[in-house]
Amino acid sequence: TSEVDVLVVGGGAGGGVGSAGNNTHGGGGGAGGLILAPGLAMDADEAVTVTIGGGGASTTAGGDTTFGAAPSPWYLIAKGGGDGGDQPRGDGQAGGSGGGGAGSQSANAEASGGATTQGQQSGNSGNLGVGYAGGAFGGGGNTVAHSAGGGGGAGAVGGQASPGGGNYGAGNGG
């Protein structure tokens, strides 16, 4: 028996679609959830099934990545990222890391960033997993806001967006 360190990462999501006619931007796609499982005891000749989650196309969530199979104690699921908000939907979607909220088409509207679901997984997938929420678009009174929230990452929450400013006020990725 040997000890191995295992890194499992879900597929990243696609960003949301903006509206050229309304000069709004889609939210950033969330990163896939990340799991670092150090010191797993495994036999050298032990076969392990691994499924790699693909990245999402525009407005599509990333796929889940799995390591092992249930009911093994080292069965791990890294959730795919949540897709970025688009128009007219607005809100970013939940995932391993959440997608960012889209820029608004109307005055004072808000769009939430998607929540992270990685920590809600059972067993080591949640206990050892990391993911953060997407950033939101917080309104601000401009009919054409341009900006959008950044997708969440493995290191931080996605940046909040606000109208105006550099880069049209878009939030940074987490």
Predicted regions and their residues:
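Ser/Thr- (and often Asn-) enriched beta-sheet segments in non-cytosolic proteins
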Residues: 47-51, 77, 145
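Glycine-rich strand-loop-strand elements at beta-sheet edges
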Residues: 9-70, 84-90, 99, 164-165, ...
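GGW-centered surface loops in extracellular recognition modules
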Residues: 1-10
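Extracellular/periplasmic catalytic domains that process cell-envelope and extracellular macromolecules
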Residues: 1, 71, 123
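Short, well-ordered surface patches within globular domains
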Residues: 74, 78-84
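Glycine-rich (often Gly-Gly/Gly-Pro-rich) flexible segments and glycine-rich loop motifs
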Residues: 91-173
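Structured loops at beta-to-helix junctions and adjacent beta-edge loops in soluble globular domains
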Residues: 38, 81, 133-135
